[in-house]
Amino acid sequence: MSLRNERLNQILTEARPKIARHWSLYDGGFGHGGTAAAVAGVDELLVGYFGKLKDMPDGTPATTILHEIEMLLRGLAEVNASCGGAYLETDERDLLVPIIIEAATVAGLDANEFKDADPTLQFRAKLLIL
């Protein structure tokens, strides 16, 4: 396994308990307005995102990595909509966006090329998510 993929595995392994702990702070352990399906959906989307990044060869163009960020955020927007639009908000942004950016950076994206070093911002603004 490449060092890049080892690092991606490490990021996800460290993130999953933090995310689970976050959901546990809310009634029923699902987050505000969420369901077990929503929690599972977020987890599935994150695992899929990391899998896509790990499948990319070294030197993958930034546009390809950005596409995966956009697809992840579109999926998260769908999960949020399924919960009345109030499931993924500020606290979740503060939790998930750094994980998304760190993974993209490890995959080869230079986050410093984006406003506030946040390559998710353009998609979050368009999708009204996080």
Which residue stretches match the model-derived regions?
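Residue-level recognition of alpha-helical structural elements
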Residues: 38, 61-65, 85-92
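Generic alpha-helix signal with a bias toward terminal, lower-confidence helices
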Residues: 24, 57-58, 77, 88, ...
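Mature extracytoplasmic domains of secretory-pathway proteins
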Residues: 53-80
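Charged, amphipathic alpha-helical oligomerization/scaffolding segments
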Residues: 41-48, 68-71, 75-78, 95, ...
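Amphipathic alpha-helical binding modules
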Residues: 84-130
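Short secondary-structure junctions and interdomain/linker hinges
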Residues: 26, 56, 60, 79, ...
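Short terminal alpha-helical segments
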Residues: 1-55, 127-128
